[in-house]
């Protein structure tokens, strides 16, 4: 029997879990091709913070090594960002010109960091915190620079601040709210957490809005200016002010999106040949960012595929 061609765009935790579930059900049904925008096999993004802090290595957080893909007959194309979906010819095209035809297409493009729309947000030294490349950039910067500013006092921002402090940087966290983790903690608990982190040497600017990132003409960030006029030095600025579903590819192909790629209860998009799982998908008005519901999506999607 001729195998059905399944192409997956994205090589993260939700997408690869879908493949694992699919292989459990029937390992011979699909001819699978995976495009990964990063030059790495699937790894655990949740553990990037221990890597930043020097508690784990990149190798230790890999979930599916290259041998796993080969053993399961999966064609893995790393460092290939897909830039086009041709829904008529049923094929995807990557930035380097490589392409693959599909009978079924699985979009697992994840999310992208929200970069504040302020002057200087494209300067060298201004990064999000989402992947191995971001983590490595922070580790490299900590070796040669001193001052880090983390924008965002949520969990991700505090993990970045803690890791950078452990790497020896002088760290300031800037947060819009009156206290840290305001969605998870009340004021009292937030202030207790702040005190514990201040005891580790991390500084805080709460109820503060970032107005501009400055470079003094060098092309690299050197300072942060706030809405009250204060300026502090910054060799590194980490944007940890939230994420957005990565829908750019789907939208360019005319697939309906609204704060995520719109999917039904079987994770099918408005194009019946195309599915979406993970942080890029919007199911009944919700784009999930936690692992447990994303793994449930993977199971449902695999069963329907």
Task: Report residues per predicted region.
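Beta1-alpha1 glycine-rich phosphate/pyrophosphate-binding loop at the start
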Residues: 2-75, 163-184
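A Rossmann-like FAD-binding core segment of flavoenzymes
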Residues: 31, 76-94, 100, 167-264
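A conserved beta-strand/loop capping segment in the N-terminal third of enzymes
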Residues: 67-120
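Residue-level detector of alpha-helix initiation sites
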Residues: 13-16, 39, 111-113, 133, ...
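Phosphate-coordination loops involved in phosphoryl transfer and adenosine-cofactor binding
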Residues: 3-5, 79, 144-147, 207
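FAD-site-proximal beta/loop scaffold in flavoenzymes
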Residues: 122-144, 215-225, 229-303
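Short hydrophobic core segments
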Residues: 9, 100-110, 151, 232-242, ...
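Glycine-rich dinucleotide-binding loop and its adjacent helix/turn
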Residues: 109-167, 263
């Amino acid at each position: 029997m001729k195998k059905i061609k399944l192409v997956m765009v994205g090589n993260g935790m939700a997408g690869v879990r879908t493949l694992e579930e699919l292989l459990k059900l029937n390992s011979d049904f699909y001819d699978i091709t995976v495009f990964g925008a990063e030059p790495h096999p699937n790894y655990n993004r949740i553990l990037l913070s221990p890597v930043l802090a020097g508690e784990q290595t990149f190798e230790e957080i890999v979930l599916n090594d290259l041998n796993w893909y080969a053993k399961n007959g999966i064609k893995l194309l790393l460092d290939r960002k897909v830039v086009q979906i041709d829904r008529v010819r049923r094929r995807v095209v990557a930035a380097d010109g490589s392409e693959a035809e599909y009978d079924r297409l699985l979009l697992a493009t994840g999310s992208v960091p929200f970069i504040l729309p302020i002057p200087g947000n494209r300067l060298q030294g201004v990064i999000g915190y989402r992947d191995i490349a971001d983590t490595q950039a922070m580790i490299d910067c900590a070796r040669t620079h001193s001052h880090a500013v983390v924008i965002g006092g949520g969990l991700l921002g505090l993990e970045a601040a803690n890791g950078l402090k452990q790497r020896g940087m002088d760290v300031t966290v800037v947060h819009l709210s009156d206290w840290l983790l305001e969605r998870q903690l009340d004021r009292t608990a937030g202030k207790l957490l702040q005190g514990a982190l201040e005891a580790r040497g991390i500084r805080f600017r709460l109820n503060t809005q970032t107005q501009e990132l400055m470079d003094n003409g060098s092309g690299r960030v050197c300072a942060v200016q706030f809405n009250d006029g204060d300026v502090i030095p910054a060799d590194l600025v980490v944007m940890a002010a939230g994420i957005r579903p990565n829908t750019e590819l789907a939208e360019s192909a005319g697939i309906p999106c609204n704060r995520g790629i719109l999917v039904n209860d079987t994770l099918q998009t408005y194009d019946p040949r195309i599915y979406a799982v993970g942080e890029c998908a919007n199911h009944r008005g919700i784009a999930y960012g936690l692992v447990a519901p994303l793994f449930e999506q993977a199971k449902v999607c695999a069963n329907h595929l």
